[in-house]
């Protein structure tokens, strides 16, 4: 890691403390420009679709096209961000977004944009966002102290919501005065400026002692890590449900704005700005809220407030009623999103952080994409107001139910130890194929059940989290106290990687295992190559 924090930085827990660090401040401004471009693009695309067609499903599909790539490409992008130099990867994603914006501007100039073309290019822009988000999420914990991570993530939320205000304002002004094409051109310019800032970042090149991981195995390991953690799965379930219902208000907002008296692009801008302002104001109070409530309680309360605000928006027949409701929705949105983001960040070690955050992104964007399509179709069958009301009711009931089914959204507060086994030849030049590691334990008969429970739950999860291909526990029939743990790795290099990934929690678990062993010598370890038939 490249933490530049000293003791003073660790003790500075004010909401703006991370901005006092030059690297974070530079990246935060870059993220602000990137988010500003994203919101300008989304607003312009959504409003343009209303001029191309009046069908609610087409308009809602703009939101689906923008978010679906993040669901489809989340894990591959996270694996790449963990396996490649993050600075270069971040730079490439920005240049992609700029290229898409320029191409869309050209098609608009030629008059070749149709609803299908607009959706396709919105999808292409979403590809750039899908590739960009995991790498930025993985970089932030590198440059701020762990104690300041909640504040750093809240500031990223402020960046998102400041752009949620400024983006629609700028886009609305340009659309009303000079036309939509200028929104996409400005989007391209801001993306290029952000790319220039990233290129000037003096980041030490990443070193991969064991070489870069292959894409498919890296994806498998990232998925395994998250799936072997109940707290992380609880976070993923909550973020999926929260965005599945809350995306309804964003997907249908252009039509809601038009339905209000005198509704136009300015009405749409005011509603989006109200939501963004609510999020910014709420971010200032998040440190106090975190001290008063647990993460579990914060997420549940925020979800219920979000559902209530959606119901109010669906019933509002005047802008002065809808805008305050959107303000409350924005406050609830950042409270829930920030709390869940902090929970998963604190539960991920550096080696798998981008992959873990990409799976979080998949859950978030999958919920958004599916929700936009579902609630758009419900609006087509019924009405916009009915669709929003049903979404609000579903969100409140769903989040309340999951809070009792999976109440744990805590995280393991550990860091990498980088513990390397000195007795192992790390070159392994002559080793090819899958590797099987056999570890033999001798356990007192009275403690057999206790040992089995430890190994089959904590032991299994630890091995699979760190990348093992498979795991088994064998119990000797003739010697009841004799167990053999069988760990299969995809290759010799992947076997070595597991030692680089050990955390304090893994080390504590190793001591627990050894406490059960009563043999005169340490547990016997055998390393085998699996001979496969041809």
Per-range role (PLM):
Residues 46-53, 105-110, 166-186, 259-261, ...:
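Transmembrane alpha-helix termini and helix-breaking/packing motifs in multi-pass membrane transporters
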Residues 62, 72-76, 83, 89, ...:
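C-terminal transmembrane bundle of multi-pass solute transporters/carriers
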Residues 138, 142, 184, 188-214, ...:
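Helix-loop junctions on the cytosolic side of multi-pass membrane transporters
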Residues 378, 434-442, 472-501:
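Short, well-ordered beta-strand segments in beta-rich or mixed alpha/beta enzyme
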Residues 26-42, 66-81, 85-100, 117-176, ...:
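Substrate-agnostic recognition of the 12-TM MFS/MFS-like secondary transporter fold
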Residues 382, 401-432, 469-482, 508-534:
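Glycine-rich beta-strand-turn "strand-cap" elements at beta-sheet edges
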Residues 9-68, 228-273:
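Helix-loop boundary and gating motifs at the non-cytosolic
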Residues 447-470:
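Short amphipathic alpha-helical segments
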């Amino acid at each position: 890691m490249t933490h530049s924090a000293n003791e003073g930085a660790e003790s500075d827990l004010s909401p703006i403390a991370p901005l006092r660090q030059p690297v974070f401040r530079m990246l935060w401004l870059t993220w602000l420009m990137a988010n500003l471009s994203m919101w300008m693009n989304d607003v312009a695309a959504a409003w343009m679709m209303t001029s191309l067609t009046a069908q609610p499903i087409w308009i809602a599909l703009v939101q689906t096209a923008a978010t679906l790539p993040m669901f489809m490409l989340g894990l591959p992008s996270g694996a790449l961000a963990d396996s490649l130099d993050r600075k270069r990867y971040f730079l490439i994603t920005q240049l992609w977004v700029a290229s898409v914006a320029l191409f869309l501007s050209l098609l608009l100039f030629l008059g070749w944009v149709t609803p299908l073309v607009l959706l396709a290019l919105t999808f292409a822009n979403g590809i750039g966002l899908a590739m960009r988000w995991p790498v930025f999420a993985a970089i932030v914990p590198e440059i701020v102290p762990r104690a300041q991570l909640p504040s750093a993530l809240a500031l990223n939320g402020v960046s998102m919501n400041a752009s949620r205000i400024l983006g629609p304002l700028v886009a609305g002004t340009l659309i009303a005065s000079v036309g939509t094409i200028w929104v996409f051109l400005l989007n391209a310019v801001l993306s290029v400026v952000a790319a220039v800032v990233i290129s000037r970042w003096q980041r030490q090149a990443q070193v991969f002692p064991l070489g870069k991981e292959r894409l498919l195995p890296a994806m498998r390991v990232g998925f395994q890590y998250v799936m072997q953690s109940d707290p992380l799965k609880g976070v993923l379930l909550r973020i999926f449900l929260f965005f599945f219902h809350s995306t309804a208000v964003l997907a249908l907002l252009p039509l809601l704005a038009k339905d209000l008296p005198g509704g136009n692009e300015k009405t749409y801008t005011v509603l989006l700005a109200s939501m963004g302002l609510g999020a910014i104001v709420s971010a200032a109070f998040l440190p106090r809220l975190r001290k008063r409530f647990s993460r579990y309680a914060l997420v549940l309360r925020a979800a219920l407030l979000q559902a209530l605000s959606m119901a109010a928006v669906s019933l509002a027949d005047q802008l002065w009623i809808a805008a305050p409701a959107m303000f409350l929705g924005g406050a609830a949105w950042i409270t829930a999103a920030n709390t869940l983001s902090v929970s998963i960040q604190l539960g991920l070690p550096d080696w798998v952080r981008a992959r873990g955050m990409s799976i979080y992104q998949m859950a978030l964007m999958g919920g958004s994409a599916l929700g936009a399509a579902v609630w758009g179709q419900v609006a087509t069958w019924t009405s916009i107001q009915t669709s929003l009301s049903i979404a609000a009711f579903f969100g409140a009931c769903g989040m309340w139910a999951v809070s009792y089914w999976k109440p744990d959204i805590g995280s393991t507060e550990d860091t990498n130890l980088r513990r390397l086994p000195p007795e192992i030849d790390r070159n392994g030049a002559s080793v090819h194929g899958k590797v099987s590691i056999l570890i033999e334990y001798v356990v007192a008969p009275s403690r057999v059940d206790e040992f089995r429970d430890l190994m089959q739950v904590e032991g299994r999860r630890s091995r699979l989290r760190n990348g093992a291909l498979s795991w088994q526990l064998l119990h000797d029939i003739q010697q009841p106290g004799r167990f053999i743990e069988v760990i299969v790795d995809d290759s010799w290099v992947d076997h070595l990687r597991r030692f680089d990934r050990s955390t304090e929690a893994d080390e504590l678990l190793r001591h627990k295992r050894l406490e059960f062993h009563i043999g005169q010598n340490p547990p016997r370890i055998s390393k085998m190559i699996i001979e496969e038939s041809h």
